[in-house]
């Protein structure tokens, strides 16, 4: 683009010069009229033209033959015009041919049949300019009319033109026309009719205006010949300044006229007049140059401001900033750009800075090396979209009036002056051009408003028809124009999605659409052929294009939806399936979608076929549904295998799964994984097939006894078969004889092939694991070592390594441990059975089993999941050292890669005092691909079970050793009372051994052995590797749960029991060693306390087992309950001794359930006594603290009691005062009653109202009394007698004490009325009462 800047600068200078030249020429011609105007009528005519309206371009004379020759050269590659029509009514008369005379005095024959001299004064674009990309254009040949006086006026008016505006001048691609204007001169002798054929000529605008002092001399050297018959000139052709400069520089401008040998004098006079006119024009140009130089200064100031704006736009592009500075230095002040050019530069820079549509994986995986190696198209294809033929519908650009690439020009043909038939032909020609993305003569691109949104619909190109068109034709054209817009959009979509980064699925879609576009172009060419044969009309064209419009509408919807969703890979397929269900209402549309989907899914199905049949992924553009994590690598797959490799090496992309394979995505993943495993084992799939066939043949041959001749024949056949198999394997070593998957509407086709591939891959891998890698024998070896199935090996190993395991963890010699392990393996029965005994190694875990189990169970207590740290057991990396003071330990802890690391959890689990017995574990080296089944997680589960069983065996061994020592030293016990104590210890020890033996028997014979047999049988009948993995994991999970290692409560109970047994055994052994310092009372207390602890632990364990066994998943615990509580021994014992655990409840509640006492080796008796003394001191301190607390509490209680007593006394005094006040009031009332002697009954007293009130209150307030109306009347009667009889007031109060509610109401009655008012009422009431009493 920067290389075109000088040309654009020249265009602006040239046009500004033309504008100023026209203004100066107008002023000079008005002040100084031209010479010889009277002598030459032609000059009179030109003078009239200049005086009527200002001239726009300098009038020069050019040989018409040159114009015709140039036109013929430009149109050599164009098809001939399809039709010609005349504007005038008179036919063209014959004319004479003349050879033009050039400046070099050499004559060349002309190819034209008419000779005219034309001058142009144009402001409109050329009427017949032919773009280089158009297929065919219509040439309009205008024929001039005959010479007459009436036509002279018309031709003169046609010669006058309007001056060009600035908007027309700044268009860099506006083409000046060469419209001829005929001037006819009337002669007295004859009237000649001449014809001037209107031709088109494309004149370049990038011509620099240069001064040439030899113009006049060159013109004087030209030999000009005149027309015969007294006719000087028939017409002039006025050309713009550009054509004049081109004419002068090339020395090719000549004048041609019809030659007549009889009129030489007239020709010479005419030639002289022409030369004078040229001289005058040259003088005007010299005057205009001064004015142009002054305008340059102002122009440069304006352009400097525009340059600053352009530099701001180019600052974002760091690569191009240096080039811009170099260009500015090179051109300097001479680089002048038009405003339109600057707008185009600004738009291109804006497009470059805009965020381009890119696939999603380019944003998420910018650092991937595979992304960096993707090929790309050059940047100029994006920066300069006008070089591509799809620029009309560039999706990233909205075409406004400032951005259109020299489009939306005025109509080049005036349709109003053309007949209807030819007007329709012009419209058809323009439609054919717009159908392939090219503007026509009358159909242009519609201007898009700048305020419109930037959606995809706004980027759809709209075409506008200009000029006067019939309504019927306009309607047909408007129906066809959407097809042109759809074609431009779809074509640009193809150009964008053909980029490399969009992937092969998008490429296949673009290829399928491109095939449809080729057929579309064939249809356009067929329509053009009918147009040339004049058999095509708009109606016929609409009839032919109706199905095509519907097809392109669907293509537009598909492409626009893909662009809107920014779909990539399989997303395009899913989108096509969605649109198919939405728009496929008829068969043709369904067939179109089927064609697109079939072509689009072809590369995906090839990738799928390669994955499920060979286990290979070829996905350069991240389009396949399986993603390969290339960052996850393994240096040595046989020794240091990581489970993450199998789980995370291949993963499913959820957004790239086709809808018809959604339910089978996991099966597709595992199928390719299986084949990849076989490939990782350095064994091709085809070789595996051949190996299976050869094994079957060998087995059949071994079973049948053959003669010697038959054996020779079989050998020959086998050799020939092997040769054929080798040839096949050499040609296609990695190919499987399977059919390629093809697209089908029936999903069962895919499902059947995927199922077959899955069964085949799983069968190959199972055969590899079971038959070649001996999976069952490996599992049997792990059972022997980790599950303690071989008693002779384990007992021998414990005896030989017991002294070493008593040491602390940092003092254990790993070389010695491994050597002792191998010794015990060689000397036991396993040495003959197991071929893989060398893969077993010793390993020490630097924390206790309790901490490990509780950490796994309560893994959410930590911020991050914990890691199990293991010890490196390789004898090559570990050196044996016995120096405890050295800082370098013999055990190097390494973090396992199966779980996530958590330093905080590791520090919590790690203990300082840890012995070899507590941390011993086995490690087993499993090679690839057996590590798929026996993974690192599975080995950790085996280690947990082994550590638990080993701890039980160790406690059992310690208890048995104590019994043997007691039996050995029993004869030396002479101290009285000691034998009875030992009998109690034997009894408790026997109970502990019984508990341990039954627990071991339950775990080994009722949990591990039956579950292992089930696993073995199910593996033999399994069909896939995933089934084998699932069966093995289920076996380990059931073993852990049934061995009571997955519940915190059960784990704490078991660990407390183990620690109790260890402490009791150490106590009894140390007691026997120090016979002199034996304290019988202290021994009795320790024995009784340990017995109580044992019973408490056993009772809690049995209660928890009973509660757990109620659920169906824990029915297995019933067997352990029956074994521990055989014949209800312990249950009856606990029932007979209900007070056994009452004293222990308070102490046990204070202790935490999650922490168990550490397991320690045997200590001396003195050390144990010291520990007991320390414990006693601590207990005394605790008791003192408790006493102090109790005293404080008692004091507080006494204070509270005193306060309560004081409050009660105050309340009693207040009540007494209130009672006294009430008694005083009652006395006053009685005195008043005695004075009145019963005559003081209230005047307003009413028995009926009182009775009703009494009934209402009793019914509303209480329902417990259940009083009847008769009792109410009795109460009222008593009250009335009491009021009348003042002497018997006390008696009435005692009688009514049983009804306090009535008393309250009676007291509330008013007593101001007199008895005289209610005497009659009282009599009636007494009569009623008497009747009631009688009843």
Swiss-Prot record:
Cellular location(s)? Cytoplasm, Cytoskeleton, Microtubule organizing center, Centrosome; Cytoplasm
Q: Which GO terms describe its molecular function?
A: gamma-tubulin binding
- Record has tRNA processing as a keyword: no
Bias (Low complexity) occurs at 27-40, 58-89, 102-168, 187-198, 1144-1156
The superkingdom of the source organism is Eukaryota
UniProt keyword list: Cytoplasm, Cytoskeleton, Microtubule
Which BP terms does GO give this entry?
cytoplasmic microtubule organization; meiotic cell cycle; microtubule nucleation; mitotic cell cycle; spindle assembly
UniProt xrefs under InterPro entries: GCP (IPR007259), GCP_C (IPR040457), GCP_C_sf (IPR042241), GCP_N (IPR041470)
- Annotated region Disordered: the residues are 27-198, 250-274, 308-341, 1144-1171, 1287-1309
According to the UniProt entry, the coiled-coil residues are none
Q: Bias category Acidic residues: which stretches?
A: 316-332
Pfam families listed in its UniProt record: GCP_C_terminal, GCP_N_terminal
Q: Which residue stretches does the UniProt record annotate as biased composition, category Polar residues?
A: 41-57, 170-186
GO terms under cellular component: centrosome; cytoplasm; gamma-tubulin complex; microtubule; spindle pole
Described by its record, this protein's role is as follows:
May be involved in microtubule nucleation.
Enumerate the PANTHER family for this protein: GAMMA TUBULIN COMPLEX PROTEIN (PTHR19302), GAMMA-TUBULIN COMPLEX COMPONENT 2 (PTHR19302:SF13)
Protein family: Belongs to the TUBGCP family.
Can you name this protein?
Answer: Spindle pole body component 97
What species is given as this protein's source? Dictyostelium discoideum (Social amoeba)
């Amino acid at each position: 683009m920067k290389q075109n800047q000088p040309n654009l600068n020249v265009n602006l200078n040239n046009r500004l010069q033309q504008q100023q030249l026209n203004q100066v020429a107008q002023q000079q011609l008005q002040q100084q009229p031209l010479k010889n105007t009277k002598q030459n009528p032609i000059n009179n005519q030109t003078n009239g033209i200049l005086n009527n309206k200002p001239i726009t371009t300098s009038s020069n004379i050019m040989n018409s033959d040159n114009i015709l020759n140039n036109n013929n050269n430009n149109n050599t590659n164009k098809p001939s015009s399809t039709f010609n029509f005349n504007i005038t009514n008179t036919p063209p008369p014959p004319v004479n041919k003349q050879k033009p005379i050039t400046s070099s005095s050499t004559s060349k024959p002309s190819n034209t049949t008419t000779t005219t001299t034309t001058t142009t004064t144009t402001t409109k674009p050329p009427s017949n300019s032919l773009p280089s990309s158009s297929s065919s254009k219509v040439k309009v040949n205008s024929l001039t009319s005959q010479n007459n006086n009436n036509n002279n006026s018309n031709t003169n008016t046609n010669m006058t033109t309007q001056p060009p505006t600035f908007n027309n001048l700044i268009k860099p691609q506006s083409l000046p026309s060469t419209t001829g204007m005929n001037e006819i001169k009337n002669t007295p002798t004859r009237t000649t009719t001449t014809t001037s054929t209107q031709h088109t000529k494309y004149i370049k605008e990038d011509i620099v205006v240069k001064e040439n002092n030899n113009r006049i001399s060159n013109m004087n050297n030209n030999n000009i010949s005149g027309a015969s018959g007294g006719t000087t000139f028939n017409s002039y052709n006025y050309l713009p300044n550009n054509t004049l400069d081109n004419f002068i520089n090339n020395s090719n401008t000549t004048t041609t006229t019809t030659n007549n040998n009889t009129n030489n004098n007239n020709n010479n006079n005419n030639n002289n007049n022409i030369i004078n006119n040229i001289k005058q024009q040259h003088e005007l140009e010299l005057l205009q140059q001064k004015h142009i130089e002054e305008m340059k200064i102002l122009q440069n100031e304006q352009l400097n401001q525009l340059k600053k704006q352009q530099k701001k736009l180019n600052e974002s592009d760091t690569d191009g900033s240096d080039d811009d500075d170099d260009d500015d230095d090179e051109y300097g002040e001479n680089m002048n750009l038009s405003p339109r050019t600057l707008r185009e530069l600004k738009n291109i820079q804006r497009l470059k800075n805009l965020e381009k549509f890119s696939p999603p994986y380019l944003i998420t995986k910018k650092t991937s090396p595979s992304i960096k190696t993707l090929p790309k198209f050059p940047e100029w294809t994006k920066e300069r979209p006008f070089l591509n033929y799809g620029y009309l519908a560039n999706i990233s650009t909205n075409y406004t009036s400032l951005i259109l690439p020299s489009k939306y020009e005025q109509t080049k043909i005036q349709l109003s002056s053309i007949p209807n038939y030819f007007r329709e032909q012009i419209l058809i020609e323009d439609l054919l051009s717009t159908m392939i993305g090219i503007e026509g003569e009358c159909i242009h691109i519609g201007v898009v408003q700048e305020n419109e949104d930037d959606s995809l619909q706004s980027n759809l190109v709209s075409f506008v028809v200009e000029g006067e068109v019939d309504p019927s034709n306009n309607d047909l054209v408007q129906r066809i124009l959407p097809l042109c817009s759809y074609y431009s959009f779809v074509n640009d979509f193809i150009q964008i999605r053909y980029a490399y980064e969009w992937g092969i699925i998008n490429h296949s879609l673009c290829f399928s659409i491109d095939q449809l576009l080729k057929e579309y172009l064939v249809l356009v060419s067929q329509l053009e052929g009918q147009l040339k044969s004049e058999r095509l009309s708009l109606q016929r064209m609409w009839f032919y294009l109706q199905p095509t419009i519907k097809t392109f509408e669907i293509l537009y919807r598909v492409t626009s939806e893909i662009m809107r969703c920014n779909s990539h890979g399989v997303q395009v397929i899913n989108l096509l399936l969605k649109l198919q269900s939405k728009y496929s209402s008829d068969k043709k549309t369904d067939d179109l979608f089927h064609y697109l989907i079939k072509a689009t899914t072809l590369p995906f199905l090839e990738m799928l076929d390669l994955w499920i049949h060979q286990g290979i992924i070829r996905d350069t553009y991240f389009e396949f549904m399986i993603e390969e994590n290339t960052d996850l690598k393994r240096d040595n797959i046989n020794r240091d295998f990581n489970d993450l490799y199998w789980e995370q090496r291949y993963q499913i992309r959820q957004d790239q799964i086709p809808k018809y394979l959604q339910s089978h995505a996991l099966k597709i993943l595992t199928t390719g994984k299986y084949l990849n495993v076989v490939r990782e084992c350095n064994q091709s799939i085809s070789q595996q097939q051949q190996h299976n066939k050869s094994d079957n043949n060998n087995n059949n041959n071994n079973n049948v006894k053959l003669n010697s001749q038959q054996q020779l024949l079989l050998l020959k056949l086998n050799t020939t078969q092997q040769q054929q198999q080798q040839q096949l394997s050499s040609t296609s070593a990695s190919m499987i004889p399977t059919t390629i998957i093809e697209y089908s509407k029936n999903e069962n086709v895919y499902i059947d092939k995927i199922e077959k591939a899955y069964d085949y891959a799983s069968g190959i891998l199972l055969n590899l694991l079971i038959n070649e890698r001996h999976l069952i024998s490996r599992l049997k070896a792990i059972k022997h070592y980790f599950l303690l199935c071989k008693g002779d090996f384990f007992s021998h190993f414990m005896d030989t390594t017991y002294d070493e395991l008593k040491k602390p963890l940092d003092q254990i010699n790993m070389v010695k441990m491994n050597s002792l392990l191998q010794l015990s393996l060689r000397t036991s029965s396993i040495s003959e059975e197991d071929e893989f005994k060398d893969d077993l190694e010793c390993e020490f875990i630097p924390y206790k089993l309790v901490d490990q189990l509780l950490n796994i169970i309560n893994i959410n207590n930590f911020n991050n999941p914990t890691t199990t740290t293991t010890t490196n057991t390789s004898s090559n990396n570990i050196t044996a050292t016995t120096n405890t003071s050295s800082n370098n330990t013999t055990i190097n802890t390494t973090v396992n890669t199966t779980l996530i690391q958590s330093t905080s959890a590791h520090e919590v689990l790690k203990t300082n005092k840890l012995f070899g017995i507590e941390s011993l574990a086995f490690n087993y080296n499993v090679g690839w691909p057996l590590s798929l089944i026996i993974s690192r997680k599975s080995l950790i589960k085996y280690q947990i079970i082994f550590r638990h069983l080993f701890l039980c065996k160790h406690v059992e061994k310690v208890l048995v050793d104590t019994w043997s020592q007691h039996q050995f030293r029993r004869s030396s016990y002479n101290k009285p009372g000691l034998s009875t104590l030992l009998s109690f210890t034997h009894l408790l020890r026997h109970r502990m051994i019984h508990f341990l033996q039954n627990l071991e028997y339950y775990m080994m014979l009722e949990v591990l052995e039956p579950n292992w047999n089930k696993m073995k049988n199910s593996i033999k009948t399994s069909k896939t590797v995933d089934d084998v993995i699932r069966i093995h994991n289920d076996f380990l999970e059931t073993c852990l749960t049934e061995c009571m290692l997955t519940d915190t409560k059960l784990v704490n109970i078991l660990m407390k029991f183990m620690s109790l047994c260890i402490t009791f055994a150490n106590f009894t052994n140390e007691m026997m060693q120090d016979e002199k310092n034996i304290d019988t009372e202290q021994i009795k207390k320790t024995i009784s306390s340990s017995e109580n602890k044992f019973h408490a632990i056993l009772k809690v364990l049995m209660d928890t087992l009973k509660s757990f066994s109620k659920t169906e998943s824990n029915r297995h615990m019933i067997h352990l309950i029956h074994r521990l509580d055989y014949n209800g021994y312990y249950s009856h014992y606990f029932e007979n001794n209900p007070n056994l655990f009452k004293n222990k409840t308070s102490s046990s509640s204070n202790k935490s359930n999650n922490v168990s006492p550490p397991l320690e080796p045997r200590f001396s008796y003195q050390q144990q006594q010291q520990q007991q003394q320390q414990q006693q001191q601590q207990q005394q301190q605790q008791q003192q603290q408790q006493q102090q607390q109790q005293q404080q509490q008692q004091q507080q209680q006494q204070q509270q009691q005193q306060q309560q007593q004081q409050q009660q006394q105050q309340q009693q005094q207040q009540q007494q005062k209130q009672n006294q006040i009430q008694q005083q009031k009652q006395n006053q009332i009685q005195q008043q009653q005695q004075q009145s002697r019963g005559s003081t009954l209230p005047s307003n007293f009413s028995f009926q109202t009182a009775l009703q009130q009494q009934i209402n209150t009793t019914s509303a307030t209480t329902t417990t009394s259940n009083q009847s109306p008769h009792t109410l009347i009795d109460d009222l009667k008593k009250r009335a007698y009491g009021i009348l009889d003042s002497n018997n007031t006390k008696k009435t109060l005692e009688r009514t004490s049983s009804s306090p509610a009535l008393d309250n109401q009676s007291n509330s009655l008013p007593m101001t009325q007199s008895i005289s008012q209610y005497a009659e009422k009282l009599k009636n009431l007494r009569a009623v009462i008497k009747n009631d009493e009688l009843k």
